[in-house]
Swiss-Prot record:
Subunit description: Homodimer.
Alphabetic keyword roster: Endoplasmic reticulum, Lyase, Membrane, NADP, Transmembrane, Transmembrane helix
GO molecular function, one term: iron ion binding
Protein species of origin: Oryza sativa subsp. japonica
Signal peptide span: none
Gene Ontology terms: biological process: lipid biosynthetic process; response to cold; response to salt stress; response to water deprivation
Annotated Fatty acid hydroxylase domain residues: 139-273
Family statement: Belongs to the sterol desaturase family.
Pfam family, one: CER1-like_C
Induction data: Induced by drought, cold and salt stress.
Name the UniProt record assigns to this protein: Very-long-chain aldehyde decarbonylase GL1-6
Any Gene Ontology CC annotation: endoplasmic reticulum membrane
Length: 635
């Protein structure tokens, strides 16, 4: 919203959500019907028929720019504005497709009211020339002065400040405006197209090509990384006045009173509003930042979970990624899209960077193994996955990372013995491998209700279940188990004085269930009403009961100073981070010198105290004091 929203700020279909596309459906259906039933090629309205395909292509084109831009800003040394992007901006820009819908509706209206548009050929050279001349002349000139007017305090406060709320721009920032402002832009940019229609020189390629040109230039100017090669300006020096660069327009968003031009800087040069640092910023960003300034200190290695998670990734759909996995209302559309995108992931032979954050001078990156959970559980794919992880470890060390955390199934015992395999193979490994067990156990203990005397432990035997059991026994909390194999496995690894707190039982009467991987719905149905299900696994259990309390997987709230966080980590809420991921950050902040993988454990109390001291806070979607609550959630 603008600082003082004026009339017609909201778009007319604001309350329709994704149902806004239904506004285009009648015209699209009628257009297709007319095209198919036309008796001859001469009667077919090509311009009208192409409206809906162009809508789909422009949506895809916009998404491709989002993906490429986010990939570049997560890793590129050519990033222009190195400031933080937040959830507020993502929410503000989630309606970037509104202007595409408006374009389709306007095109249908023009086709219905102007007979000249109904006989448009595929190509017209005259139409192309008319469009180019009118854009470079009236459109660019009028836009320049309109833009300057919008920076007058009255119009700026009521309209244009909405667009300028985004200091760090993304490609779609270019089309984020109040409805009234967007309508004025539409009238202005319609001059070339309507002129070609009126003069009978319109063509399908000219009209739609002009839309593609506008999209390209808009997205280029707001992508926040420099990609225009210097050689273009050497070959044709006047191009400097006809083509703006991402760095040129970024100065308008940081300085506000310079570089007003639409796409052609010539008018800024004519009227003296060119920012004096434009050339210097272009040269500097094209050359790139010093490598030492953007190398990662901490790398969190994760992987995709379900096919839908492809679009929940930061490089996917921005609005979807800014909410917990599974929260999107259009889940069926995501599944359909993932059916197309998922097979392409097999082409990736290494990890890709999806996110870059910063905390207390630490550069933190998230790398993604392009494989799904199903690949990790498949025996035939296990070796390939392990090789991908090992390559990521080598790449992290080569990049200078001090710590690498293994997220989700990247730390499986059968896969790599909780990360120990890579330390054994590379004894001189400088990057510390952290599986996050200590902090994850601490987060679980914090979720257990205060006053609990006994718990029921279910799931598969693994490192975290052992450390969790040991921590509970030290606190003299009885740990019951119904699985004899799990009981025997854990018992033989506990000291004799601790074993008395371990009980093999056939009862499911405990009010607190600690659930790991492998817990079935049938087992959950045996719990008493009001029981607490506290996961200690990376993945949340299936919620089979409506009368029980389900806690989140081990996680913490990130410090307020944690920068550039604008996506949700899997199923966790905003600004909440899994304990395994947070453990690596704490490890680096504390400059601990050892690994936490295999049989090595940092220490539950040590990890928890350090996390709290560094600004992390306990998180539980069902708030209550933990079993050893000290007023801050401490252990």
């Amino acid at each position: 919203m603008a600082s003082k929203p004026g009339p017609l700020t909201q778009w007319p279909w604001h309350n329709l959500g994704n149902y806004k596309y239904a506004l285009v459906a009648p015209s699209a259906a009628y257009s297709t019907y007319r095209f198919v039933t036309a008796s001859s090629a001469a009667e077919r309205d090509l311009l009208n028929f192409m409206v809906f395909p162009m809508l789909l292509l422009r949506l895809l084109y916009g998404q491709l720019w989002i993906t490429v831009s986010r990939h570049q800003t997560a890793r590129s040394k050519h990033k222009i504005v190195n400031k933080s992007l937040d959830f507020e901006q993502i929410d503000r820009e989630r309606n970037w497709d509104d202007q595409i819908i408006l374009t389709a509706l306007v095109f249908y209206l023009v086709s219905a009211t102007m007979p000249q548009a109904q006989v448009a050929p595929w190509w017209s050279t005259k139409g192309m020339v008319v469009t180019a001349v009118l854009h470079a002349g009236p459109v660019e000139f009028l836009y320049y002065w309109l833009h300057r007017a919008l920076h007058h305090h009255w119009l700026y406060a009521r309209y244009h400040s909405h667009h300028h709320a985004s200091i760090v721009t993304e490609p779609i920032t270019s089309v984020i405006h109040p409805f009234a402002e967007e309508v004025v832009y539409f009238v202005l940019l319609a001059i070339p197209i309507l002129s070609t229609v009126a003069t009978g020189t319109v063509s399908v390629v000219t009209a739609n090509g002009y839309l593609v040109y506008i999209d390209f230039m808009n997205y280029l100017g707001h992508c926040n990384f420099e990609l225009v090669p210097k050689c273009l300006f050497h070959v044709f020096p006047p191009l400097k006045y006809l083509l703006y660069t991402p760095s040129f327009h970024s100065l308008h968003h940081t300085q506000f009173r310079t570089n007003y031009s639409l796409f052609m800087p010539v008018y800024d040069y004519i009227y003296g509003t060119t920012d004096k640092s434009s050339d210097e910023l272009y040269e500097r960003t094209l050359q790139g930042r010093d490598e030492a300034a953007w190398r990662p200190d901490v790398v969190h290695l994760t992987h995709l979970t379900t096919p839908e998670s492809v679009f929940h990734n930061r490089l996917g759909f921005a609005a979807v990624a800014s909410n917990p996995l599974g929260a999107a209302a259009s889940g069926h559309l995501l599944r359909a899209a993932s059916a197309v995108a998922s097979p392409l992931l097999s082409l990736f032979a290494s990890t890709f960077r999806s996110e870059a954050n910063r905390l207390d001078k630490l550069n933190i990156e998230t790398w993604v193994i392009p494989r799904f959970t199903s690949h990790y559980t498949s025996k035939s794919d296990g070796y390939k996955v392990s090789r991908l992880i090992e390559k990521a470890v080598s790449d992290a060390e080569a990049s200078g990372a001090r710590v690498l955390t293994l997220g989700l199934l990247n730390q499986g015992y059968d896969l790599n013995r909780n990360g120990e395999l890579y330390v054994v193979r590379k004894p001189s490994l400088k990057t510390k491998i952290v599986d996050g067990t200590s902090l994850a156990v601490a987060a679980v203990l914090n979720m257990i209700p205060q006053g609990t005397k006994d718990v029921l432990l279910l799931g598969n035997a693994n490192k975290i279940s052992l450390v969790l059991t040991l921590s509970l026994c030290k606190r003299e909390i009885q740990v019951r188990m119904v699985n004899k194999e799990l009981y025997e496995c854990l018992k033989q690894q506990l000291q004799p004085e601790m074993q008395e707190h371990l009980v093999l039982s056939c009862s499911y009467s405990s009010k607190v269930w600690l659930v790991g991987d492998g817990v079935t719905d049938e087992e959950q149905m045996k719990a008493q009403k009001g029981s607490h299900f506290v996961p200690y696994s990376q993945f949340p259990p299936n919620k089979a009961r409506n009368d029980c309390v389900y806690h989140c997987t081990p996680a913490l709230l990130v410090p307020e100073s944690f920068e550039n966080l604008h996506v949700c980590e899997n199923w966790l809420p905003r600004r909440v981070m899994s304990a395994w991921r947070a453990a690596g950050i704490v490890h680096a902040l504390e400059k601990w010198d050892g690994h936490e993988c295999g049989g090595r454990v940092t220490g539950v109390q040590k990890a928890w105290s350090a996390a709290l001291a560094r600004g992390f806070r306990p998180y539980d979607d069902h708030h209550h004091p933990g079993i050893t609550h000290d007023g801050r959630g401490g252990l």
